């Protein structure tokens, strides 16, 4: 498939993704609020915001790796791509551990950070831990996603993300009906992220060029460049 066709498919599928997810979200939000109090939903948003702040502990590797991976794939320089991939994986792995540790420390003081009056502390802690694990998995997945984007497979990503959004919505509905409150939102998100991470790994393994996806040697020069 030519680069132009891939680009056009990427644009079209992006619009389809935006339209369908917006429609589903317009239905899902009020549906969720029919099971969860607005104040409890606010707890979920607050906990998600805390995770976002913790994610600032990343080294900012993803943006640089995206451009480097695209450059290497364009030149078919797979030796350099392997160096960038290995170094990025190690750095993202380090970021994942750092985010996990800080997140676990925050969990110990969650009742001091968030006023849990009127809501089960178990629900708050469980939701926070699930969101934390989701964040860690996402960080570790980022270099793999960047390789696929650099290889101009964004149209496939859009289709997969759309399918996973629907799967996440279905799990959310299921968990809400089972009475899991705000835990439903975090659990369904984690399930979707685990699925997309597994699919991303398989797709990268099936690319026409071979990469060692497990962290190999750490290249200091590449680290400085990134």
Per-segment meaning from a language model:
Residues 125, 129, 159-207, 225:
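Hydrophobic alpha-helical transmembrane segments
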Residues 1-7, 200-226:
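Interhelical loop/hinge segments that connect adjacent transmembrane helices in multipass membrane
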Residues 13, 47, 84-87, 91, ...:
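Hydrophobic core positions of alpha-helical segments in small-molecule transporters
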Residues 5, 36-44, 76-86, 97-132, ...:
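Membrane-interface helix-capping segments at transmembrane helix termini in multi-pass transporters
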Residues 4-11, 133-160, 183:
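Membrane-interface junctions at transmembrane-helix termini in multi-pass inner-membrane proteins
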Residues 6-71, 100-104, 134, 169, ...:
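Signature of the first transmembrane helix
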Residues 1-5, 37-39, 54-92, 113-116, ...:
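Transmembrane-helix boundary and interhelical linker motifs in polytopic inner-membrane proteins
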Residues 9, 13, 17, 82-98, ...:
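Alpha-helical transmembrane segments of multi-pass membrane proteins
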């Amino acid at each position: 498939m030519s680069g132009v066709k891939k680009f056009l498919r990427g644009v079209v599928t992006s619009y389809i993704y935006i339209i369908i997810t917006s429609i589903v979200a317009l239905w899902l939000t009020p549906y969720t609020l029919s099971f969860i109090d607005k104040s409890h939903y606010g707890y979920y948003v607050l906990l998600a915001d805390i995770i976002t702040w913790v994610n600032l502990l990343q080294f900012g590797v993803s943006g640089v790796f995206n451009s480097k991976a695209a450059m290497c794939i364009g030149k078919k320089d797979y030796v350099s791509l392997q160096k960038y991939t290995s170094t990025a994986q190690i750095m993202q792995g380090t970021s994942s551990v750092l985010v996990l540790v800080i997140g676990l420390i925050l969990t110990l003081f969650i009742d001091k950070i968030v006023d849990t009056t009127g809501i089960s502390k178990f629900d708050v802690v469980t939701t926070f831990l699930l969101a934390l694990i989701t964040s860690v998995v996402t960080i570790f997945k980022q270099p793999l996603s960047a390789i696929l984007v650099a290889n101009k497979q964004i149209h496939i990503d859009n289709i997969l993300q759309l399918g996973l959004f629907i799967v996440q919505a279905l799990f959310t509905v299921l968990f809400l009906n089972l009475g899991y409150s705000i835990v439903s939102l975090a659990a369904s998100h984690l399930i979707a992220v685990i699925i997309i991470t597994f699919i991303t790994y398989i797709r990268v393994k099936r690319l026409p060029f071979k990469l060692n996806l497990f962290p190999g040697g750490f290249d200091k020069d590449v680290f400085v460049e990134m």
